[in-house]
Regions:
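Glycine-rich phosphate-binding loop used to anchor ATP phosphates in small-molecule kinases
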Residues: 1-12
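Short beta-strand segments
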Residues: 1-3, 21-26, 78-83, 96, ...
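Conserved nucleotide-binding/hydrolysis micro-motifs of P-loop NTPases
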Residues: 6, 27-32, 84-86, 116
Length: 169
């Protein structure tokens, strides 16, 4: 399940399903926030309609995920979008290993599935991995100053090529 609010339910999930493996799908903070801003969610995501609120929400998500990692060491895998784009097969094998699943060549052809998919990204699941969305936030950099400022505690820890110009030294 990839609902944006589910990170807050990890403790409950681990209580009712103690052997559950948690996969945290990660992306560059600005790309993640811009993606949420562009998506019209059904309900329960009112934070996604304002860039400042998105930034604050993302900081809370980051804080909570650090807490869950400390509370459940080795039971949460951070699956980084950018790493998957660069090394899809290697990262997919790591994911399957974490889940205790066997490798199948079809894992690289996920887009060939015939089953119904009901998510905000259902169209993306029906095509090969698209690299054009990586660092897409750079297209909006001159318009997202408030978001950059809000996320600066996280962005300052990134390599310079992943930082907004305003935060580079």
């Amino acid at each position: 399940d990839k609902m944006p609010n589910n990170f807050s339910n990890i403790c409950f999930l681990k209580l009712i399903l103690p052997n559950a493996k948690i996969i945290n799908a990660c992306r560059h903070p600005l790309d993640s926030c811009i993606s949420s801003y562009k998506q019209l969610f059904y309900k329960g995501q009112s934070w996604s309609y304002d860039l400042f609120e998105i930034g604050e929400y993302y900081l809370e998500y980051d804080r909570m995920m650090r807490h869950w990692h400390n509370l459940f060491p080795g039971e949460i895998m951070d699956f980084h979008y950018e790493s998957v784009l660069e090394k899809q097969e290697i990262e997919t094998k790591k994911l399957l290993d974490f889940c205790g699943l066997e490798w199948e060549e079809q894992c690289l052809k996920f887009y060939e599935t015939k089953r119904s998919i009901n998510t905000a990204s259902s169209e993306q699941v029906r095509q090969p991995i698209y690299k054009g969305a990586m660092y897409a936030w750079k297209n909006y950099e001159s318009h997202i100053g408030e978001l950059i400022e809000t996320l600066s505690p996280l962005l300052n820890d990134l390599n310079d090529d992943a930082k907004p110009q305003s935060l580079r030294k």
